[in-house]
Amino acid sequence: MCCLFGLMDCRGYFGAKKKAHILSLLASECEERGTDATGIAYCTNGHLNIYKRPAAAHELRFRIPGDSRVIMGHTRMATQGNAVRNRNNHPFTGNAAGGKFALAHNGILYNDRLLRCTNGLPRTKIETDSYIAVQLIEQKKVLDFSSLKYMAEQVEGTFAFTVLDEHENLWNL
């Protein structure tokens, strides 16, 4: 399975270097749950940024802007979808009213193909079970408690999700 990690600096106490150092430590500790890929999502100047690579966390150098207050991360052990294809790595990007969002998942979803068929969702080049969560939220056209609840009630399997939007709202399911 994978691992989720993150950092919230609501008061802006940490500088960019300190945030990068803390994230590097957190991500490296998460490697025991996955070394196939590592990714983070954060906001700066009202824009959502995603940095992900098919590499173990200790191989990456995180550069976080000083104004980023909320950062979510993911280390991956690939179960579906080749990690070398970066599109299969987390966090994923989605779109809803109000802007973009990032989603990362830990666990295994068993009904992703069934949900894609029954909900008329398009097939994508992303080869993971996790991406169905993005599609279900996008189907509702808004990122809020109701769409997250809908998504969580539809998927079957084991899961923990983190979702970050462009306004630095963070949801943990």
Name each region found by the language model.
Residues 1-173:
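Conserved short alpha-helical segments that host acidic/polar catalytic motifs at enzyme active sites
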